């Protein structure tokens, strides 16, 4: 979220007198469209359902799963509270994970620093100043062991938000499990492993699309045989939404990428029903409760129909759109950060009303820095209050049947399908990205949003209306700069302890496999066990495949 966070700088502020007048105006008028610009009727009724297929909604746990992927939803099991965390060194992040587990979090979600995401070791010139800043620095197997020290990997589910270097980090995770005596069959978790959205919005790509798709498919193929409980790709709309996409664009470009991944796996010889059950999704939750709830309902219906009608899937699990939700980082403001607590709570409510399987709530200070421990705890408590006090988890799809929600669900579905059809017309996701189609659409939506903010037609409380005159500087988390030097020293010590002949042999084996068509995962696991670092493996693959250079899209 850091790279793409929308800013509200330059937006007009108002005086206290103007605030009172604005309050009067707010009582008289309200927005007539959703946050994404979909028109809202003043009142919805039975006529809004005219022409809707009788099976469009159904019941939870049955096709097309509009109302939920399980019959009982949260009555059977609450959503997973998966707070995203990671900073500085493996030792410090390990302490934060233990703290979160002690506070009631049930799973882990790992944030990696930019050098790790981009395939650079901590002592690389490109990494200087970025080590441990926006996530944890992981260079080697020693770091990965430290990260999960005292945390049995067969007792937790771990999500790793990592893309270009996802196969390497997964190899490190598997190697740590082996050292803990944990079988591969017992490992559960997720690698994001979604490169196509990096070309569209986020930008942490290394290799061109073709070898990137090959790496993704290697992970899917290997994991389907070796890690039966592992979600091999978390296909992500979140980052595109953070870059400015509308709700419909978020779903459409996510599903277009998912289609490309499934087609690549099928072309490798895999069966749809062997791989699709381990695909999961990652979406954003914005503050527009009605639109977001409808979006999540539409997502389930669209994916179920795509898998059944387009790919011929017959396994019920292949049809399920299981998704993680994170509240919208780009909706947080640097001004009046206490308002962000309210925003995040409403966003979390939308995720739960929409039937999310897991949820991360952002800390109130994340427009400024990584969250403090206090902020992270409050974010977790927000989820716990929502789960145990708000009364929204006791019935399945509580807004289902609302004329407004059903109409918005249909409208979003229609827009999504039109965008997928246009992507298909261009030749699929990879060709559409090369043509700049999704990038341009998102840029246009982001521009329209910011224009409305700066013009005052879109109210951002505390930014362009209802501005607090008293400005305070909240305490924020800061990364100790000495930690970077410690990480570099630790890396050098690790390198000095290795069997250099074994390291060279394993690196050569990876290069040979990369030039051919052999699955790279076994070679990566052998390599990290021999002592190869993230940067060394990434550097070797750069030699073989080159680096992707983004084209300017206007």
Show the residue positions of the predicted features.
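Weak global preference for isoleucine
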Residues: 138, 151, 162, 168, ...
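Conserved active-site and cofactor/substrate-binding residues in soluble primary-metabolism enzymes
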Residues: 60, 91-95, 138-142, 164-171, ...
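Poly-acidic low-complexity segments
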Residues: 104, 152, 183, 194, ...
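Catalytic alpha/beta active-site cores
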Residues: 2-286, 291-292, 310, 317-326, ...
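Generic secondary-structure signature for well-ordered alpha-helical cores
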Residues: 106, 149-153, 175-183, 217-229, ...
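Flexible, glycine-rich loop/tail regions that form catalytic "lids" or insertion modules at the edges
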Residues: 4, 22-50, 59, 63-65, ...
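Active-site capping/gating regions of soluble enzymes
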Residues: 236, 252-261, 268, 277-462
